[in-house]
Amino acid sequence: MQLKNPILGLCQQSTFMLSAAKVDQCPDDEGFEVAFAGRSNAGKSSALNTLTHASLARTSKTPGRTQLLNFFKLDDDRRLVDLPGYGYAKVPIPLKLHWQRHLEAYLGGRESLKGLILMMDIRHPMTDFDLLMLDWAVASGMPMHILLTKADKLTYGAAKNTLLKVQSEIRKGWGDAITIQLFSAPKRMGLEDAYTALAGWMELADKGAEIAE
């Protein structure tokens, strides 16, 4: 028999809840939310779809298509949130400013937000957007877990070296509280570590693992 992460079943039964263009359109601010953030084309939607075993988040050949706060229901008390992608050059500046304003309002005022998953493309980590998110997480005391996405694009040795380099840089600049891992959506690499982070933030880790046949 094999131990099963308690968050896995909830992720597999997740459903689309609603999209919000601004904070007052979000669900009631109660329960547990974990938000997924990342620069455009960092693989955010693909990672979210892989974790939920579904096609919940819209993927596109054109980065920056996620323009709303998209909420996905795990159960009556728990939600995942797909945040707008940032940084794509073809997105008009007024739209970028609109996204930034409402993202800041969501991140700064959402009581139910328990943690932030930040996606970084392993080939281009620590962008200006990533640094801003790291600064915000530390300043606000928000738990953060980083997925170095597209790890399959590098050899394992190169991916591991990048992980160690970014991990060292984060520890020097932002302390030891932020965790980081390798992740690949197509190869399904790193799922268990990501599920463990989600389970802890959603207060499922102490409920005991379910036994899978």
From Swiss-Prot:
Cellular compartments per GO CC: cytosol
Example GO BP: division septum assembly
InterPro entries: G_ENGB_dom, GTP-bd, GTP-bd_ribosome_bio_YsxC, P-loop_NTPase
Matching PANTHER family: ENGB-TYPE G DOMAIN-CONTAINING PROTEIN, MSS1/TRME-RELATED GTP-BINDING PROTEIN
Cofactor: Mg(2+)
Record-stated family: Belongs to the TRAFAC class TrmE-Era-EngA-EngB-Septin-like GTPase superfamily. EngB GTPase family.
Species: Pseudomonas fluorescens (strain SBW25)
Protein's job: Necessary for normal cell division and for the maintenance of normal septation.
Alphabetical list of CDD domains matching this protein: YihA_EngB
Domain EngB-type G: 30-204
An example Gene Ontology molecular-function term: metal ion binding
Residues involved in Mg(2+) binding: 45, 66
Protein name as annotated: Probable GTP-binding protein EngB
Name of the gene: engB
NCBIfam families hit by this protein: GTPase_YsxC
